[in-house]
Amino acid sequence: MKIIFAGTPVFAAKALEAVQKSGFDILLVLTQPDRPAGRGMKLQASPVKILAQQYNIPLLQPETLKSPDIQTQLETLKPDVMIVAAYGLILPEAVLRIPRHGCINIHASLLPRWRGAAPIQRALLEGDAETGISIMQMDQGLDTGAVLLKRAFLIEPHDTAATLHDKLADLGGKCIVETLTLLDQDKLTPTLQDNASACYAAKIRKSEAEIDWTRDSTHIDRMIRTFNPYPGAFTSLHGSMIKLWQANIINRSDTRQAGEIIAADHNGIIVACGRDALSINILQKAGGKKLTAAQFLAGHPLQPGEHFQKTTQGHL
């Protein structure tokens, strides 16, 4: 089976490696052009580009797939299928029609739930019990195509967006190999999505990560896990921005105000919420490093009665 692979970040690189190691014939890799990144804003290759070069797979980095020249190059290869994983470019209808079996997408949710840009974060923030990978036949809609294969797993209580990403990336690689094997054997049965059950995973906005202490502790804990590693759930303490990276829910009824510090010692910084409380275990001051509660308190002693608050001063 002759394959074109299109993807850009680590999530896609995991899938590319799984396909390559399974012995499938990858004719070409498409990935985004090198982009400026880091403090020096130097051009950096995508994880998919780096991997393709390691395996000596032919590589193209077009700015767009709308170009007739690019489309002609793809047609000339006569691919059986194109795999798309977090590529970042729109696939015109002309490109979708090029492979014999069309284009198939690796999507990090259980479609039709969480179509769109941020399925991992939305599943966490909404408190979903499970998530997974859907392999989808691409059409012109936004994640609306028929599902070819779906695999689910439970979201663990301490999962973050980072840990879920890694689990889903590994599962995505396994699922695309399974899909290609079934496709080669003509054993796939497409299942149309139920549009009435669909919901949209909008792109994450930094403003969403500001903690509202009047919410219950379960929701705030989900926020902290959802926005780890990006952009980091944040609050204000003594007028300074603080990011919270890890916390535990404390089930306790208390008359303290939301955001009020109940206790602060080496075991954690316990803060009252709209319902119950949170023990903050890892936090970060603006311009500083991530610190345990004990490390933070050694340099910034806190007393019961002090408050974390909402802020409009911006982000870390």
Curated annotation (Swiss-Prot):
Q: Which NCBIfam families match?
A: fmt (TIGR00460)
The record's comment on protein family reads: Belongs to the Fmt family.
Q: Which reaction does it catalyse?
A: L-methionyl-tRNA(fMet) + (6R)-10-formyltetrahydrofolate = N-formyl-L-methionyl-tRNA(fMet) + (6S)-5,6,7,8-tetrahydrofolate + H(+)
Enzyme Commission (EC) number? 2.1.2.9
What protein is this chain from? Methionyl-tRNA formyltransferase
What broad class of enzyme is this? transferase
Q: What is one GO cellular-component annotation here? A: cytosol
Residues holding (6S)-5,6,7,8-tetrahydrofolate: 109-112
Keywords of the record, alphabetical order, are: Protein biosynthesis, Transferase
Q: What is the purpose of this protein?
A: Attaches a formyl group to the free amino group of methionyl-tRNA(fMet). The formyl group appears to play a dual role in the initiator identity of N-formylmethionyl-tRNA by promoting its recognition by IF2 and preventing the misappropriation of this tRNA by the elongation apparatus.
Question: Does the record carry Nucleotidyltransferase as a key word?
Answer: no
Which InterPro entries does the UniProt entry name for this protein? Fmt, Formyl_trans_C, Formyl_transf_N, Formyl_transf_N_sf, Formyl_transferase-like_C_sf, Met-tRNA-FMT_C, Met-tRNA-FMT_N
Q: Name one GO molecular function term.
A: methionyl-tRNA formyltransferase activity
Q: Does the keyword Hydrolase apply?
A: no
Q: Which domain of life is it from?
A: Bacteria
